[in-house]
Swiss-Prot record:
Keyword Oxidoreductase tagged: no
Pfam families per record: AcMNPV_Orf101
Keyword tags: Host nucleus, Late protein
One term under GO cellular component: host cell nucleus
Coiled coil: none
Organism classification: Viruses, Viruses incertae sedis, Naldaviricetes, Lefavirales, Baculoviridae
Protein name (database record): Protein C42
Amino acid sequence: MSVIDVHIRIDSLRRLIDENMQMEIWPQLLRMCSDTVSDVDVDTSALMAFLVTVARKSQTAFANANAATASAFAAGGARAPAAMPAPAPPAQTVFGALVSAPSAEPALVDMRRYRAAARRLIQYYSLNTTTSSEFKVRDVVMTMIFLQRSENYHQLFKLLDTAMDDFTCRPQLTEAQVSTLLHTLRTLLEMPTTPIDMTTVDVMRSSFARCFASPVLRYAKVVLLQGETVSRDERTTLEELLVERGDNIQKLQPQQYVASGSEIPFCDDPEFINRLLKHLDPYPLSRMYYNAANSMFYTTMENYAVANCKFNIEDYNRIFKGAESIKKHANKTAEDSDELDIYLGTTAKRKKII
């Protein structure tokens, strides 16, 4: 095997396992690409960490593939394939063990609906218009799925995919790529005579970047956790979880480590204290409690989803009810505009402190 082949194999492993090359084994493997090095010493601990990482990624990919297959059959969008003789497996090498065999990708259901959603959303974010339309998170998801699965519009997907990162500028494109991108955009919008240039592309990309960075899309996410202990076939309740995990909860002990003592430093500088109070004065205490309860809501929803537990509105409302005793004893001033009487439900009302 030549040095170029070895480098290609190592680069393939890097893209599959550790794209940023943060593991310790990469400098040791790259020594094989040198013509002057006759012997290569590989650290055992680095090799074991590399193999453990490979095993975990393989287990995660296998679990995700099984979940996708089960979801497809549960939704009625897939049928059992006909039995066919399995082809002979190709010869496996050390560097080609993780290369997956090519498989036919399942066709999406009703791609015309995905195309219509993508065309409507991109047309709204690309062209100058005075009308306003309502879009949902599913419209953005359908647009990205359609662009990613369509070969003709895959270059447009790559451009919008970079908007998910913290990049302020679009990537550099050649003249051929610019011409192909503009032709692709005109074809998708079905407006061959509309003047479309790179300014239109920049407006579209910046609009999608703001859309991807919105709190609605950032909080509406699916978290995949490793292991099979986080999934349940049947939905449970909070009371059942407390009974099931009561023994483990009782065994928990508070743990705290103080590095340099627990004394609170004393400040005798009145000017600094007054300046600090001026910074804290615009932020009422009730607003701090509201932000904390809001953060607890998102964390609670994620924990409920992981445990497949039924969400009870009254359990969440106890967070605000427990803070009402503090609010009753607080001084009510005219500047206080935030309060804690916010409950979930159809009859929820918001009161203002006067």
